[in-house]
Amino acid sequence: MQARLQAIADGVDGTFGLVVADLAGQHRFEVNADRQFTQASCIKTPILLEVLKQAHDGKLQLADRRWVEKQDKTGGSGILAELGDRTVELSIDDLCVLMIVMSDNTATNMLIDQIGMENVTATMASLGCEQTVLRRRMMDTAAAARGEENLSTPADAARILRLLHEGTFVNREVSNHALSILRKLKSGAIRSTVPQSVSVAFKPGELPGLLTEWALVELPERPYIVVVMGTYNPRSSTDDDLDAAMKQVGKEAYKFFKGRK
């Protein structure tokens, strides 16, 4: 299995990192697991966790409502930027759902402003995920031009997903709330390699030259994690090439774990 995954990574004209980890046994396979990658929308998972942690700590209420103001709106993915100014009032929990399911950048920035960028990074460090850092809001082109990117590693992402599966991010209730939102997504490279009857809690991300995906595949009796992060050379490759490599990893993982007990 390790050799097959390494061959997939070696076939990418760029940099490719992955973790495939067994949650019911000891199997774990890695390639570039400790390498930092820009996360694109996958950084929204740590943001979600910080929101839920602060709700548990009494710093905010998930039922609290926020108007979507003109100054909140930002471009890129999502729907809130297309709506009228101050015509929509949403709960913090609803903003979380929009951030994950629609990857809504306006909802994401509203949540970052609510919880504090530095708190996301601090919480990740407290979990042993020191390489996972939130350094800018969504669509902040000036910060991006300065090289301030939101980062993580395959190993950190796998650790975060394991904590959610085990119910040890804050507690079982908070972990389950996060998973319930992450399960709402329908389309992703790893998701596509698993039968629809199998639940997958996941978040994909995409930027020019970059694809990422964090996935917890809840295969009955044999749950497992697949994290893939990759960049490619746009002069010789495309999104489709990297997406195909990610799907190969997902197929290998499903084939490996299916039927194991």
Predicted regions and their residues:
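Conserved catalytic neighborhood of penicillin-recognizing serine enzymes
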Residues: 73-109, 117
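Structured C-terminal helix/loop/strand segments within mature extracytoplasmic catalytic/sensor domains
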Residues: 1-8, 28, 114-116, 159-188, ...
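Acidic helix-start/capping segments at beta-turn-to-alpha-helix junctions
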Residues: 23, 62-78, 115-116, 181
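Active-site SXXK
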Residues: 26, 38-66, 226
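Soluble periplasmic/extracytoplasmic beta-strand elements of cell-envelope proteins
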Residues: 17-21, 30, 46, 67, ...
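Mid-domain, small-residue-enriched loop/turn segments at the edges of structured enzyme/sensor domains
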Residues: 15, 88, 109-161, 165-166
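Active-site-proximal beta-strand/loop segments in catalytic clefts of secreted hydrolases
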Residues: 21-23, 70-71, 100-103, 114-115, ...
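Beta-lactamase-like hydrolase cores
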Residues: 1-35
